[in-house]
Amino acid sequence: MKPAAREARLPPRSPGLRWALPLLLLLLRLGQILCAGGTPSPIPDPSVATVATGENGITQISSTAESFHKQNGTGTPQVETNTSEDGESSGANDSLRTPEQGSNGTDGASQKTPSSTGPSPVFDIKAVSISPTNVILTWKSNDTAASEYKYVVKHKMENEKTITVVHQPWCNITGLRPATSYVFSITPGIGNETWGDPRVIKVITEPIPVSDLRVALTGVRKAALSWSNGNGTASCRVLLESIGSHEELTQDSRLQVNISGLKPGVQYNINPYLLQSNKTKGDPLGTEGGLDASNTERSRAGSPTAPVHDESLVGPVDPSSGQQSRDTEVLLVGLEPGTRYNATVYSQAANGTEGQPQAIEFRTNAIQVFDVTAVNISATSLTLIWKVSDNESSSNYTYKIHVAGETDSSNLNVSEPRAVIPGLRSSTFYNITVCPVLGDIEGTPGFLQVHTPPVPVSDFRVTVVSTTEIGLAWSSHDAESFQMHITQEGAGNSRVEITTNQSIIIGGLFPGTKYCFEIVPKGPNGTEGASRTVCNRTVPSAVFDIHVVYVTTTEMWLDWKSPDGASEYVYHLVIESKHGSNHTSTYDKAITLQGLIPGTLYNITISPEVDHVWGDPNSTAQYTRPSNVSNIDVSTNTTAATLSWQNFDDASPTYSYCLLIEKAGNSSNATQVVTDIGITDATVTELIPGSSYTVEIFAQVGDGIKSLEPGRKSFCTDPASMASFDCEVVPKEPALVLKWTCPPGANAGFELEVSSGAWNNATHLESCSSENGTEYRTEVTYLNFSTSYNISITTVSCGKMAAPTRNTCTTGITDPPPPDGSPNITSVSHNSVKVKFSGFEASHGPIKAYAVILTTGEAGHPSADVLKYTYEDFKKGASDTYVTYLIRTEEKGRSQSLSEVLKYEIDVGNESTTLGYYNGKLEPLGSYRACVAGFTNITFHPQNKGLIDGAESYVSFSRYSDAVSLPQDPGVICGAVFGCIFGALVIVTVGGFIFWRKKRKDAKNNEVSFSQIKPKKSKLIRVENFEAYFKKQQADSNCGFAEEYEDLKLVGISQPKYAAELAENRGKNRYNNVLPYDISRVKLSVQTHSTDDYINANYMPGYHSKKDFIATQGPLPNTLKDFWRMVWEKNVYAIIMLTKCVEQGRTKCEEYWPSKQAQDYGDITVAMTSEIVLPEWTIRDFTVKNIQTSESHPLRQFHFTSWPDHGVPDTTDLLINFRYLVRDYMKQSPPESPILVHCSAGVGRTGTFIAIDRLIYQIENENTVDVYGIVYDLRMHRPLMVQTEDQYVFLNQCVLDIVRSQKDSKVDLIYQNTTAMTIYENLAPVTTFGKTNGYIA
């Protein structure tokens, strides 16, 4: 039970009820007294009331006193008596009467004297008071001694209880259970042993009164009663009465009715006025009309009636408690509105015994209008709906409606609970009253206050649209503000914007998205007018990040991005090219364009669109790929390949081509060449000879858009010929050792061909590597001695053969074959003999000399040891064998028959001397034998008086001749004189011959050692002392430097210049007084004329080598070929040019290099590959190629353009930095390569540059300075080097600035020289030579 139920209070009683109840109770008590039969009793006799229930379930209220007695609102308990001692009743409805009891149940008045056997039994046993837990019994006894009796009262239930009563005829029995049937026995006794017969009475205790009686619900025509039942309560009866005076209650509304048979735990729906309508007119209230509730009960499990507005349930049973409730609920329906009622509830036992009553008052609700609601409110009308508290009779009501506005009011009557109120004003406050009327009675009215909303806006429109904003505007005259609901299509929620203006910009939108804008005008008190809606899409976002995923010659795959969820976008593409335009569309963010033209630029514009709303366009440009090249043709030489190809696209004139040249086996170092636009051929240089290459040619257009696949071609460069090879003889072997440096590049071997006359032999040699300058060596055997062979070696690679390298080599020599015979010796005089012999066979080499050997000893086989003995040794007796004569000869190879024709006769003893051997007179009468030694190689021992070194010479001996004996001397004096004269003549002749040969040999000397022209003077100064030295020499206007320079003027001028002065060479000199010394001039190879070796150039000593530099004049038109021939033959990699071609209107140097196209200078092709023009100098790169051998190498020209025409550079740092630039480049060149330096004459500026280079090295390596000595050395190799005093001072200034920069760590070296003088002047022609050459001043 809910707490609210416990707090329920009975409704207050009306004044009429308060005075009526005591009168009613008095009447009921009088009736009880009358029904008792008039018999007095010492204890009040309680009445017994019986409530009977008929079979039809309707409770009947008995009108007879015998069946129903009223006593204080309670019924008399039912009592039964019996003589049985065990107290059992003979029947539930039987009364056991004693003999003295009358027929009407009254007790008799007779008395009886107790017999001797014991007391008489009691009689007239009554239960004068019955409550739920106790019973008061009374009884009678006619014995005279009854006052002395004691009585034993017993009852048997679970436990028997005995009560002894002494000297009184009544007993109060307590501790009983409610609504329980008890049998009490009463036994009288005297003393402790004499007992009378017992008498019994059956009594049922009252049930417990109901509790927690409450009104659980009240309505207009209904009320719900609820109470709790105690244990033993079988059912309940309700007495329901309307309360009020006759004036307050009409005949129809007056009610008094009993409702019986209400069982615990059951819900009932009962209409008490049904009985009221069927009762007999004029019957007293409360005695007629009753209702048995058994037919109205319904299960508690059923759904309760739904309450209406003014109903309230109190304490419903909790069905989840798990216990069956004993509460009873009665719903009374059909009551009168606004009426007071009193309900009295009696608990009943199973036999109808009722407990004490419980009463409660309540009032039904009056008729009322409630929940007045305005619906369909517009600016000019609204619809009212409401409810009434009396739903059952609502159709009988009419309603008065009063509408009061701010300035007007109106009334309206309707017959149903709804009404339409027209003619209202917008944005106006109204008070509305609805009053129910039933007949003449008005119920409680309902009230409503309402504001009419403003008029809907007009001209609601979109003013501006962007990707994230939409502007809106409208018109309104009565709204205070406006509420805008923004709903995105496809989204469930919406956002709200509030504004007091009549326009708004809605931001934060998504591009390309449809939005609906519902505007609601807001009036007073938050009223809202009818909405207006407009829908519009934002502008789609422009696409971005357009990406060409893949492109071919005819297709292009594009994708792009959009910054929003653009699933509904349509993308329109415009594809434009020089061939026209095309349009297409797609729903995807990618598309493949087909049918395109190769190598064509397409401009693609993409515009997003959704629902005919177009976004901003975005575009990209892309070339389709060119088609692949075809028909590749390759022509090669050793280091270059010229390629040509074809492409048949219409756009091919706009193509360039990218060539990737990859050497086989070296894919990581591919060479790339890109042609100019429209060029379909290219020459690739700096390739490796004899190597296999693969070229891939991509056509490309625009910004490097290449063809999908390259055209491929494999080729091999021509193998490089070897520069030369050397032949070495094998001592005393008929073989040749061939040596050469492996040619550059790769090779598969060499073809060696050796021939001599008709004999020919070819051999394949293994390959070699050109890395690290590897020398190749092979030996050719089984040749003939001293034979000339034509040898050809051809490099082979990739199935190609290089140009053969040829040489003529002669095999070596060995000891000549000894002759078969012996010399013929005959006596000429007493001291001389004649020896005749034939020449040795020269098949082992040309015979270079013969030696005549005499011996006085035995004839044996001579050995090489005898060659060391002379006539003097013979005379001293050191040896009996000696060499007496030596013949030098040059016999070529010949056959044996020819050698026999060649005869030699030697006079021995003529006292001649040949190469240290004295042909002295023989002893008269002496016996001599002779043999001849033939030499193919004769070697003299320098430490043994220049005599023949037999061990080192190639010699063989003839056999000794027969001995010859000399006669006696006929004239010693004549012979001696003759011998002396003859010996002197021989010596003079031989000496003159030797002198003549030596002079001839010196005239043909090709090169003079530089050791002969070492500087003879030097002024070596330490670096730390140079600044003081400079200041000293600089004093008095450079007086000290002037004296030094004066001392240098005559250095070297006396050296011969024969080659330069030859008539054939005079025209090759730019200036007639600047001629190269013969001792150091550069000689070129002789081609068709002996003077072809001349060029006006000299080797110049540098710091590291005597040939570090070549100083030359600026080329003339007729010496351009010679100039480039010198560059090639002397392996020049760098040219230093220190003049402009034209200075002050005079030609100083011919422009000897090509500017655009490659140009041939005789056998040399020169092509410029790059040119960098800077303010102080220009750097040009060339490729120099020998047309005959196809060999080439790079060449860089450093053209210094900041040397004034008459003077020196403005600052020393320019020339010093220029020098370092040159030296950095030379680190990449071969170390033996000289630097070619020239100006106009090749002496002044050229000498200054060379001197600076040497001075910097000297300072860095020796910490000393020798300006004077270096200039002296240069002038010993070429005249006029460092030509002017200004240049000499400038050299010293450069040294000073270098020394200072090292000391101060300065970078910029600044030196100003304001003096100048004439350097090179062409004077009037000299008629002596008939040439235009002048002299240099």
Swiss-Prot record:
Extracellular compartment segments: 36-975
Localization per Swiss-Prot or TrEMBL: Cell membrane; Cell projection, Ruffle membrane; Cell junction
Post-translational modification: N- and O-glycosylated.
A GO-annotated cellular component: immunological synapse
Effect caused by changing residue 1239 to S: Catalytically inactive and substrate trapping with higher affinity for substrate
Mode of membrane association: Single-pass type I membrane protein
Described purpose of this protein according to its UniProt entry: Tyrosine phosphatase which dephosphorylates or contributes to the dephosphorylation of CTNND1, FLT3, PDGFRB, MET, KDR, LYN, SRC, MAPK1, MAPK3, EGFR, TJP1, OCLN, PIK3R1 and PIK3R2. Plays a role in cell adhesion, migration, proliferation and differentiation. Has a role in megakaryocytes and platelet formation. Involved in vascular development. Regulator of macrophage adhesion and spreading. Positively affects cell-matrix adhesion. Positive regulator of platelet activation and thrombosis. Negative regulator of cell proliferation.
Pathological condition linked to this protein in its record: Thrombocytopenia 10: A form of thrombocytopenia, a hematologic disorder defined by a decrease in the number of platelets in circulating blood, resulting in the potential for increased bleeding and decreased ability for clotting. THC10 is an autosomal recessive form characterized by decreased numbers of platelets apparent from birth or early childhood.
Listed name of the protein: Receptor-type tyrosine-protein phosphatase eta
Gene source species: Homo sapiens
